[in-house]
Regions:
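Tandem repeat scaffolds
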Residues: 2-25, 32-194
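Membrane-proximal alpha-helical anchors
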Residues: 34, 179-183, 200, 204-205, ...
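Coil-to-alpha-helix initiation sites in intrinsically disordered, low-complexity, charged segments
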Residues: 145, 150-152, 203-217, 269-276, ...
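Extended, hydrophilic extramembrane loops/domains of integral membrane proteins
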Residues: 188-206
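Short amphipathic alpha-helical coupling elements at transmembrane boundaries
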Residues: 193-196, 220, 303
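Transmembrane alpha-helical segments and their cytosolic interface motifs
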Residues: 208-252
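Outer-pore turret/helix-boundary of cation channels
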Residues: 236-277
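Pore domain of cation channels
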Residues: 265, 269-327
Length: 327
């Protein structure tokens, strides 16, 4: 038998090879699913293995009792690389995983209560059913999208809409759990981002052109589900400028005289007229109504729409801003 055949045959999706000796099934103790790892000494074995430079990627640790395990790479800037590890239903209560790399790991239904996950990387990790009560999650890198969300997008590309719906339901559940835990830990910046993603996942479960999905998308664009007050400011500025342009071409009455954009007038006169319309648009949006300009004809409909939208937008901005600042 060649030397390579004595080696563990595990190779991860990034082509990292395990250098350990293989057991009867061609895999080492840590990568084999046929080896019993349910003993109480598994925690000490894993700590010793990690501290002595063991290959930690892709370990099969389903159902293992790893409470209070110390997997902090002391004295090094980078933590242990636990990429692609499978912790399905493992118990990691009070575990120390500071700065660990858990990218692409499966933490499905893992018990991480009171564990320390500060500064860990969880890119593309499966977090479905994870237990986080008391877990420290500051400065975690969750990535732009979670694992199930990426699967949902891939399913849509392949036109597997039923599977995509299931993945979006799972994504909503995960974001809800992360949001609730962030709120309980006082991490309100995280909570704000997670509520936005949670509601986005809920929207994606609706039929593509349904009224609920369209309204939800509009709310997202308008104020980021209440988490983006500056979007309201941007919308307000855009609306004021659009209405100002419309006023300039539909005309306004000023002290009994009717004014409108004139292509034959000088550039200076038209610019002055536009700024007058901009002033009127601001006054109308804020519902001040000084009375120096009055709308005529089509301008009345534009002014009515802008005044209604302005009063609603200002009130919404106050609510969203106060909510954001008082967290």
């Amino acid at each position: 038998m060649s030397e390579d055949q004595h080696k563990c045959q595990y190779i991860d999706p990034e082509n990292h090879l395990c250098p350990n000796e293989a057991t009867d099934d061609g895999l080492c103790f840590w990568h084999s699913l046929n080896v019993d790892k349910s003993g109480s000494d598994i925690k000490d074995k894993l700590e010793h293995y990690a501290q002595h430079g063991g290959f930690l990627r892709g370990l099969k640790l389903q159902h293992c009792e790893l409470d209070d395990i110390d997997l902090v790479n002391h004295g090094h800037k980078t933590g242990y690389d636990l990429s692609y590890c499978d912790f399905y239903r493992a118990s990691l209560r009070d575990a120390h995983l500071f700065n660990a790399n858990l990218n692409n790991a499966s933490l499905m239904k893992t018990d991480l209560r009171d564990a320390n996950l500060n500064c860990t990387s969880l890119l593309n990790a499966n977090l479905l059913g994870i237990k986080l009560s008391g877990c420290k999650i500051e400065n975690i890198d969750f990535g732009k999208n979670i694992f199930q969300e990426e699967l949902a997008k891939l399913a849509i590309e392949k036109k597997h809409y039923s599977s995509a719906h299931d993945y979006y339901v799972q994504s909503e559940e995960i974001y809800r759990d992360l949001r609730k835990h962030s709120e309980s830990e006082g991490l309100f910046n995280y909570a704000g981002a997670f509520i936005k993603k949670e509601l986005t996942m809920r929207r994606m479960q609706q039929p593509k052109y349904s009224a609920k999905r369209i309204v939800s998308k509009g709310i997202d664009l308008f104020c980021g589900y209440g988490e983006e007050p500056m979007r309201i400011v941007g919308f307000s500025i855009l609306l004021i400028f659009i209405c100002a342009i419309l006023y300039s071409v539909t005309g306004l009455n000023y002290h009994g005289d009717f004014y409108i954009f004139d292509i034959n007038a000088s550039f200076k006169d038209n610019i002055n007229w536009f700024f007058s319309c901009l002033y009127y648009s601001i006054v109308t949006f804020t519902t001040l109504g000084y009375g120096d300009f009055t709308p005529i004809g089509v301008s009345r409909a534009i002014a009515a729409f802008e005044a209604f939208t302005g009063s609603f937008t200002i009130a919404l901005f106050v609510v969203v801003f106060v909510k954001k600042m008082t967290r």
